[in-house]
Amino acid sequence: MNFVQNTPIFNKINISNIQFRSNPAVYTGTFEPSKDSFITYPNTDINALAQSARTNPKIAEILAEYKIPFKFNSKELEKLQQGHLKDTRLVAAKMYSALPDDLKSEVNLKDLQEAAMFHDYGKALIPEKILNKEGKLDKREKEIMELHSELGYELLKGVGVNQNVLQMIKYHHQTPDGNGYPIAGDDFSPSIGAQILSAADKYSALREERSYKPAMRKEEALKILQEDVKSGLIAPEIYTALEKVV
């Protein structure tokens, strides 16, 4: 079932009756993805990923179109693994634990956690001067930054990651109203897992210090996401699960 604003599922849940489920099934330990127990792909180490990037013709095509020189930034990837990806995975797994049962049944928790740990891997191919720019990105830089979803999809497709995880990675910046990226067509709607990942990703990013902004307090981050609900960018049930666990 797809989870979009114009479907009955938005109206079938009494949000006030959603009960918080404590102790989500989250693995804690070393955060190198190839070593996490819930990740079943042996070829997600840095060397295998770099080789996948070099030999993928679609990645070469995307980089050539935007005149981006090939560079696999392993240091940036390692930084993401230890910080933002770990944080996003923990938030996403906790959000899953707070969903009502009928929505939980639409999500594979292991796949969700893998997608959260992999979702920004495409940034290893984004030029560092854009990725860590202190000021606002211009139009061209923004277009290049937005390539990371599709680049991550292609990168991880090359090491055998399953399609459910890949779809969440590719479309974690898609929105229920169809205004996200990459362009997916009028009849596309992001899965519940992708929407959980999107909200967890944005919340984690807002709470972190970045080169272009200071870290936000929890209340500030939630207020921004509340506005996203009003704008149709986040489904109310997804936001409620986030609010309950943070």
Predicted regions: what they are:
Residues 1-39:
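Non-Sec secretion/translocation targeting segments of pathogen effectors
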Residues 1-2, 201, 236:
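Extended charged
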Residues 28-146, 157-159:
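Acidic/His-rich, divalent-metal-binding segments that scaffold phosphate/diphosphate chemistry
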Residues 87-95, 144-157, 216-234:
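An active-site-proximal "capping" alpha-helix that borders the catalytic cofactor pocket
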Residues 107-135, 152, 167-181, 197, ...:
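His-Asp-centered metal-binding catalytic motifs of divalent-metal-dependent phosphohydrolases/nucleases
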Residues 112-116, 156-158, 163-197, 213-214, ...:
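Histidine/acidic-rich helix-loop-helix segments that form or flank divalent-metal centers
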Residues 136-137, 210-218:
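Short, charged, surface-exposed loops that flank catalytic or proteolytic processing sites
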